[in-house]
Amino acid sequence: VEGSLVQFETMIMKLAKRSGFFWYSFYGCYCGWGGHGLPQDPTDRCCFVHDCCYGKVTNCNPKTATYSYTEENDGIVCGGDDPCKKQVCECDRVAAMCFRDNKDTYDSDKYWKLPPQKCQEDPEPC
């Protein structure tokens, strides 16, 4: 794993105070690789919105583009001169804040390693 996926993990640790890999890689219909069906809860919606955000990125690969950011107070400020990399940073920043803001509705008993048949509905548009 390289580029922004490592940076995304770091942001999640900073803002949500938990590992993105361990908490969000296999959650709901959208957290982790791919995504199908309808978001199952607010945390899964964070991942859906993040996937949509990555889908709108042009001129760089959001999974490998390395961006710059600074930590200020308890937040993240995206920087740099490359508009594409800055957009990737913003996608990650918004998702990490979303995870933080929805920790109280996270339900591992219900949505961790959700069977694929639970994610068969037609997806909503981004």
UniProtKB/Swiss-Prot annotation:
Please describe the organ and tissue distribution of this protein's expression: Expressed by the venom gland.
> Where, subcellularly, is it found?
Secreted
Q: Which UniProt keywords apply?
A: Calcium, Disulfide bond, Hemostasis impairing toxin, Hydrolase, Lipid degradation, Lipid metabolism, Metal-binding, Platelet aggregation inhibiting toxin, Secreted, Signal, Toxin
Q: Where is the signal peptide?
A: 1-3
Q: Which cofactor does it need?
A: Ca(2+)
Answer whether the UniProt record assigns the keyword Calcium to this protein. Answer: yes
Residues given in the record as Ca(2+) binding sites:
Y30, G32, G34, D51
Disulfide bonding pattern of the chain:
C29-C119, C31-C47, C46-C98, C52-C126, C53-C91, C60-C84, C78-C89
Its EC number is: 3.1.1.4
Q: Which GO terms describe its biological process?
A: arachidonate secretion; lipid catabolic process; negative regulation of T cell proliferation; phospholipid metabolic process
Q: Name one Pfam family in it.
A: Phospholip_A2_1
Leading EC class: hydrolase
What does this protein's record comment on cofactor binding? Answer: Binds 1 Ca(2+) ion per subunit.
InterPro entries (UniProt xref): PLipase_A2 (IPR001211), PLipase_A2_Asp_AS (IPR033112), PLipase_A2_dom (IPR016090), PLipase_A2_dom_sf (IPR036444), PLipase_A2_His_AS (IPR033113)
A Gene Ontology term for the protein's cellular component: extracellular region
Q: Which reaction does it catalyse?
A: a 1,2-diacyl-sn-glycero-3-phosphocholine + H2O = a 1-acyl-sn-glycero-3-phosphocholine + a fatty acid + H(+)
Q: Where is the active site?
A: H50, D92
Q: Which GO terms describe its molecular function?
A: calcium ion binding; calcium-dependent phospholipase A2 activity; phospholipid binding; toxin activity
The UniProt entry, under PANTHER family, shows: PHOSPHOLIPASE A2 FAMILY MEMBER, PHOSPHOLIPASE A2, MEMBRANE ASSOCIATED
Q: What is the protein's known function?
A: Snake venom phospholipase A2 (PLA2) that inhibits ADP-induced platelet aggregation. PLA2 catalyzes the calcium-dependent hydrolysis of the 2-acyl groups in 3-sn-phosphoglycerides.
Q: Which family does it belong to?
A: Belongs to the phospholipase A2 family. Group II subfamily. D49 sub-subfamily.
Q: How does it assemble?
A: Homodimer.
Q: Know the name of this protein?
A: Acidic phospholipase A2 S1E6-a
Species of origin reads Calloselasma rhodostoma
